[in-house]
């Protein structure tokens, strides 16, 4: 299950294995508290990338979507490496 969540959220760890284990545990706890299935997270990730991609040229390989949770709230945190901002004519309508 951890491998699936890591792939869906494009999680990349660094540092000591203990730190990586803590990050994975936090991710699993946040996932459980948010009650989101891996399929739903994957769909959300794809849709978010599509919307952001309308306005920004982003590095999708380095994009991270993380769930973080504390005792009161769960947050979806997105990190998008921006290559450039796409310029659109003001009259162009969004899809």
From Swiss-Prot:
Organism annotation: Microcystis aeruginosa (strain NIES-843 / IAM M-2473)
UniProt cross-references to InterPro entries, sorted A to Z: MinE, MinE_sf
NCBIfam families: minE (TIGR01215)
Cell cycle listed as a keyword: yes
Annotated family: Belongs to the MinE family.
Function: Prevents the cell division inhibition by proteins MinC and MinD at internal division sites while permitting inhibition at polar sites. This ensures cell division at the proper site by restricting the formation of a division septum at the midpoint of the long axis of the cell.
Record's signal peptide: none
Single Gene Ontology BP annotation: cell division
This protein's UniProt keywords: Cell cycle, Cell division
Gene (UniProt): minE
Superkingdom of the source species: Bacteria
Name of the protein in question: Cell division topological specificity factor
Keyword Cell cycle: yes
